[in-house]
Amino acid sequence: VSRKSDVGIEGKFFKDRLAFTVDFFYDVRDNIYRQRVTLPEYAGMITIPFSNVGKMHSYGSDGNISYHHPINKDMSFTVRANYTFSENIVDNFEEPLYAYGYQSSNGKPLYILRGLIAEGLFKSKEEIETSPEQMFGKVRPGDIKYRDVNGDGVVNNDDRVPLSYGNQLPRLMYGFGADYTWKDLTIGFLFKGSAKVEYYRSGLYNDSGWI
């Protein structure tokens, strides 16, 4: 179920040469179809069923602006730009009972990336011995030193936290372009981009395994 509110404004100036539109929206979706995760064992089900148990909301804005300038009866040019900004937040996804609040998806963007917090590099063997134990392999001086977020003396998957701007969905998309027209000939260009998005860069792989 989706409930969306939208408000916008548009205008034209200078004999319709300059035109723009801007919209703002707020969208709430509930009863999202998701797999259950908290059914008790006495339910007696072999496979966990799906149900309408999710809720999230999104908000944002989009707009465009253009300017058309006739030079003479045969020539003219037009420049334009547009943008779309959108943010989504999980309000309630059924989840396991996590030991730490930062492990939950609720209250955070959908598909947010998680990772360890790097505090620098180990400078000596003595620093390694006096630091929380890093559980991802043997550590040597020069290796990355990760933060023990929960303070239990070891660095493991329980210390993975949501990363700033760590969202696999672009929050901002934009573009701009221009056209030049002479009689029946039009030459133009268009540039598009996205921002506020991150991806994990996976390692290289060959026949022997990960490099």
Residue ranges of each PLM-predicted region?
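Extracellular/periplasmic, surface-exposed regions of secreted and cell-surface proteins
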Residues: 1-113
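Conserved small-residue
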Residues: 54, 68-168, 208-209
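Strand-loop-strand
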Residues: 99-102, 187, 193-197
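Extracytoplasmic gating/loop element in the C-terminal half of outer-membrane beta-barrel translocons
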Residues: 141, 194-211
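Conserved active-site-proximal loop/helix segments of enzymes involved in bacterial cell-wall
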Residues: 32-38, 91, 157, 201-209
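Active-site proximal loops enriched in glycine and acidic residues that flank catalytic Cys/His/Asp
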Residues: 11, 23-26, 159, 189-195
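Transmembrane beta-strands of outer-membrane beta-barrel proteins
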Residues: 18-20, 77-79, 176, 182, ...
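Short, glycine/acidic-rich beta->alpha junctions
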Residues: 3, 57, 61, 166-177
